[in-house]
Amino acid sequence: MIQFSGRACLRQGWKCAAGVGLRCHGAHSSPPLHVPPFRRYTATYSRADETGHIDTAPNESVFYFDSVLPVKALFSRRFAPLDLAPSMTGRIGNLIIKLTGATPLNVIGRAFPLELQENIQQVIPRYSEGGAFVKLSHPPNMDKEGLSSLLNTHLEQNPLKLWFSPFTSVRASLVRGRPWLEDLQRSPSSRIKVEFLPTSPGASSVELTPELLYSLSRRYGKLADIIPQPSDSKIQPRYALLDFTRPSYAVIAKNCLHGYKVSASEGGGSAGTLLKLSYERKLKPHVIRGWIVSHPRIVIPIIAAVIAAITVIVFDPIRTFFIKIQIAPPIDVQDNRLWQWIQRQASKANDILSLRQRQRSDSRGLKAIWEDRKEDIQRLQTWLLEATNTFTVVHGPRGSGKKELVLDEVLKGYRHKLVIDCKPIQEARGDSATINAAAAEVGYRPVFSWMNSISSLIDVATQTLGANAGLSETLDSQLGHILQNTANALKKVALEKKRWDGKDSHMTDEEFLEAHPECRPVVVIDNFLYKANNNPMIYEKLSDWAAALTVSNIARVIFLTGDISYSKTLSRALPNQIFHEIQLGDCTPDVAKQFVLDHLHTDQSNSSSYTQAGPDTIEGGDIKDLEDCIEVLGGRLSDLEFFARMISRGQSPSDAVHDIIVQSAAEILKMYIADVDNTVRNWTPEQAWYLVSSLAEAQGGSILYSEALFSDLFKKDGESTIRALEQAELISVTTLNDRPSTIKPGRPVFAAAFRRLLEDDVLRCRLGLRTLGQQIAMENANINKYEGELQVLGSLEKEPKEIRPRVRWLLEKLAGSQAKIEKYEKESVGLRRILQSKM
């Protein structure tokens, strides 16, 4: 509490900003506390804080001044959990009013006439209510009513409006009761509860009428309503509610009327009635929480909308920024010479410490490949500069160098590019993992994929109430949101030149993008249609998104795929368009040989720890052996690179090829024949073995597409089975005039692996027996069907002549099936004999 003694300050000769000499003192300090001239007051705690009341002499009165402090309800709730000490409360209050300059002393000094300023005895600020109590002595020949009239007249003639309350003047009201100066956690309210208490123990009190309450409280502000206690209420003591139009009016009434004794002449009963005033909340405690809990159908959708709005407003710009950084890094360290030098030095240090060959990138020895595919590279670069709105598709089997061709050669000078690999997205398990994988590919962060699981649980809970909260999002919608943010970032990157270069400022964004195709970033979608049967929705979203980018001239889109059915998916997204297509196959033997030699030469020049087989060793030895090995191995880049790596480790070419063939045979046996789950894969081991054995025995290493399709094993869904085996890369289907023509091994080395598997008599006999058993079962099923129909026809009383051709046909079919069964049985006997002899 703060006390100010006016006379003492005059005796000391100090002057304050209001023109009143003041000295500040505390009730517990006996000697006076001298304050420097530049310090306006000192915070102390007087007896009023301890008792909660202001003691007055007969010649003293107390007035309440409203709108004195700028901060209201500061200590009512905001610091409730802190349990601030009185000294701390005073220091905070002092700091606030010092910073604002609206000290109670300054305001009250300006509110009093000059002739009354020396009568100020005590100033008690009320921080929580924005006002202050002032105790002053009566001038000679003036009572409290006259003093109140004098103050009000002065304030009417000289209105005092402070900067924090420009529309409200300071008011002075005579305190008629005995105010309770509590420091409880109670915030002011526009509603006052008036309790009617007896003036002394054992006495009785009366309930004041609304008319009497109006006459007592109207002087402090306009009333909105007076609510008496219901007559049937048994709550004691009796009370009434006063609703003021403003909370400030209620504050004045509470501070001036609390403790007022209504005499008998005023209507307070024979013994009088004591008024006890307190703030009353218009809303009951926890009413908002109760309403929220009882109305989940309304509240939960609102919460969902708020969360969505916050996500869009706050996080979407951040996510777009991170995506933009991934598309166009502010500092391209890959082309920086210093960064490249640091990488080289770090690699050399790693070689020395690990005593092993430095691992280089997969682009070693690719110069010969790029020379052979120079025409394809130039064609792709030309397409990127054209203004046509269509897709560019680079198709080729896995390991044919599609990604290296596009990123290392075609887009070598492009700074603004985005690579999206579909493989980690498809291999992710669960919606959350899929969202994280998709976000990582484009740089979309922060990602709150775990929120979707929580939201799903909330949706399940709310559905029991008959409502759908709509908090959880489907995988489709979340992927769409990621792609939409990526499109926004791509558009910003494409328009960077327009923003920095003022030449095209007169153009709209669409006109600029159409006129400057060279400014469009490039989006490379790798492994397109990888495991498309698992989750085709992802590829539908990607193709639709890529079509929108292409049509809007925002970006160029290049698809890298090994699936020959890509045109079906892309044509749905971008119909009536001819795609730019590049078909990458295997290298020719000469290019493959040069690739291996260049690869070995690079390895030899970088070797510093041990001797390796290099091109000199091979060329000096048996170059014919290398050529023969490459002819067996084929021109697949991944196999050639593995072959060169094995030679660089010291193996001979023949040993390296032998190891690759053995490894490929084991891979075929495990992936396509031995561990086949028919519920997951669309082929049986017998169907895979039929193609393996047929291709191993075929002249030229290929069979006709119709030959496999007309086999008994492929009578049911034969085309879909062959397509599934092609997607699994066991075989490859070549086309002629846009129709399937021949079937070849999926990789050139598979031809030798097929022959190796067929040379294994035990494996050949076991799988042959399984195949023959399946064929016998199929023929038995046909015979049962024929016999059933013959039985139906034979049950007729008279045999019509019209059914005789049908009966003859059924008998021929039955005989043919029986002949096949006998043939299969004879082959089975031979295979069993071989198997018994080998085992």
From Swiss-Prot:
GO terms for molecular function: RNA binding. One of its GO terms (biological process) is mRNA processing. GO terms for cellular component: mitochondrial inner membrane. It is a single-pass membrane protein. Plays a role in maintaining the mitochondrial genome and in controlling the mtDNA escape. Involved in the regulation of mtDNA nucleotide structure and number. May have a dispensable role in early maturation of pre-rRNA. Belongs to the YME2 family. This is Mitochondrial escape protein 2.
